């Protein structure tokens, strides 16, 4: 059920800096995501609701409250590309993934309810790049990742399952379109997942099935997570075969994995190795668990949300070393409210 909210824009301080929004959730907020245009904000909470806000540089307003769909805490939300309409996916402790669409301004409806999609909590959800079609991946504590695919011909949804980590999967992220390039080949969808076995895993869709991407080799000899990997995020790509993935862990570590471009074989520029190595760089070791990592649109900045109530912003220098450039801490948050 959707509750349309009255239009009462709340002005915000015009001074440059963070904008604080009173979400009006009745319990802990677990995720907040901006849409493609940066004009809508979706939040989800342990109160089992999703709230949609219209936002601008100098005001925000609560547009709708989506409630009654999930039977447990809602962990994460994800916006689809606008070519598919105003579409939002949500995942919950109840093992389900729901797809919500704004059919009219301020009016939302569930267009697909994948209930009991998993046998345990669904911890992460993400839409694929629109070039692959309408696909949404979900990571679950039952150790599997599901990929929902919309069949436009008959308006139905199919599902593929990946058996990932037996201990559970906390997050999933898609490779951006253009992340990998091979002449005369259509780019295959790829995923990276965050597991409760302290590892990240890469997956590729080939010949009608999802398999482990054996072309990616991770160098874990010096830097690795020592506890659950809580989140993983594939950076936007500016050049093919120049990829970065950020992961964060319960142990407080944030690692940036950087692809080493495939080397030429025997000096032949048209022949490359069939695999690529990924080198890890420890961005920082926090004193508290790190829950979320998120890239800027260009992939130049990385936001990190940790258990110390701080959100920090990081940027890599020309030498490859990461440095903190900004922070939003609990003290400033309380002052802003």
Residue ranges and their predicted role:
Residues 54-58, 101-107, 149-156, 203-212, ...:
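Short loop/turn segments immediately following beta-strands, especially the blade-tip
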Residues 32-38, 78-85, 126-133, 173-188, ...:
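Loop/turn segments within WD40 beta-propeller blades
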Residues 1-31, 261-273, 330-337:
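Intrinsically disordered, low-complexity acidic/Ser/Thr/Pro-rich linker and tail segments
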Residues 27-30, 47-51, 72-75, 93-98, ...:
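Short coil/turn segments within WD40 beta-propeller repeats
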Residues 112-209:
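Solenoidal tandem-repeat scaffolds enriched in leucines and small polar residues
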